[in-house]
Amino acid sequence: MRTKKVVRRFFAMVMVMTLMLTTSMTVFAATGNRTYKASSKMTIVLNPGQRGDSNTVSIRVSGLPEDAIITKLTVNTGTMSYSGAVVCNSLTISSSNGRTEQIGWTGQANKTLTTSKFLASAANGTYTISFNATNMSSLNLETKSYQPSITIYWDDEF
């Protein structure tokens, strides 16, 4: 009688172990978004009638999961300071993974621009941003500055 009880318990334990090993596991992917602000300003100084590019600012993105992939990337141009009639033509963003995108932009402050060329690329890295503008004045040296930020929407299972 005792061996029968031991055999039943043994088979019960084997059944439980079998179910534990064959049951599928559910793993949840991590997703999220994070905003990174440039530590300096993009600034341009132009002579009358001149067109040119601003200085480039760098934004280091770190702290995301190692396998984080971009699902959306936006650039907020930030606050603006200016003197004169400087008209923006475009904003350029590049990443350390080799992707670059030029976005048409007329210079609005705190404008959110959505990129498309960074989708499915690695999120961690260094991003550089600059803008191109034209001095519409025919008389004076003019300036314009912005302090941009980027928001990275990411997923670690793409």
Which functions belong to the PLM regions below?
Residues 30-57:
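Flexible, small-residue-rich N-terminal segments that precede or flank a structured functional core
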Residues 48-64, 110-115, 151:
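Short beta-strands within extracellular/lumenal beta-sheet-rich domains
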Residues 63, 79-81, 135:
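Extracellular acidic, Ser/Thr/Pro-rich low-complexity tracts
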Residues 83-101:
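Short, surface-exposed beta-strand/strand-loop-strand elements in extracellular ectodomains
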Residues 9, 21-37:
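Sec-dependent signal peptide cleavage junction
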Residues 95-158:
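Cysteine-clustered segments with highest specificity for TGF-beta superfamily mature ligands
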Residues 2-14:
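Bacterial N-terminal signal peptides that target proteins for export
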Residues 68-81:
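A short beta-strand element within beta-rich, extracytoplasmic domains
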